[in-house]
């Protein structure tokens, strides 16, 4: 809406970035999750969602806005950092971006489907693998059975 007039309805489409930001405001409100997703914020170490997600049963972590599976519990490990850590994402579901904020050079990870900020990837994972350090507030969890059932519909 622009001054009470529906703009996008007249155009007939909306850019994906705009759609997910509006959906984010609707689903996340003005929360830490919104700050993480759209302002490249970071969860507090050992946040409530991390405490819930660190010991989930077999399943997948999905993008809180698009529902796309991003990370698998089979690739999760305890890095001791206070953030969810994985050795890899689900194939083709994330994008990497150079991040030079705060005087550091890092690789930012975003959801390919919604574009939201997920976290960063570092080269210090187990057995020479990467460590995907992911903010829990922007994820949902589904058991493998529930995810496979829903995705087969």
Regions found by a protein language model. Name each.
Residues 28-153:
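A short Gly-Trp-Pro
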Residues 1-2, 112:
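Short, acidic, Ser/Thr-enriched surface-loop or helix-capping motifs
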Residues 2-24:
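Non-catalytic, surface beta->alpha helical segment in thiol-disulfide oxidoreductase systems
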């Amino acid at each position: 809406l622009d001054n009470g007039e529906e703009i996008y309805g007249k155009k007939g489409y909306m850019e994906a970035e705009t759609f997910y930001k509006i959906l984010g405001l609707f689903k996340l409100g003005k929360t830490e999750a919104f700050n993480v997703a759209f302002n490249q914020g970071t969860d507090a170490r050992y946040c409530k969602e991390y405490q819930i997600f660190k010991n989930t049963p077999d399943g997948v972590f999905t993008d809180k806005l698009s529902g796309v599976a991003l990370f698998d519990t089979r690739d999760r490990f305890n890095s001791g950092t206070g953030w969810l850590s994985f050795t890899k994402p689900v194939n083709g579901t994330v994008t990497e971006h150079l991040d030079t904020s705060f005087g550091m050079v890092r690789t930012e990870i975003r959801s390919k489907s919604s574009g939201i900020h997920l976290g960063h990837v570092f080269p210090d994972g187990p057995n020479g693998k990467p460590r995907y350090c992911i903010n829990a507030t922007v994820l949902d969890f589904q058991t493998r059975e529930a995810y496979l059932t829903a995705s087969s519909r």
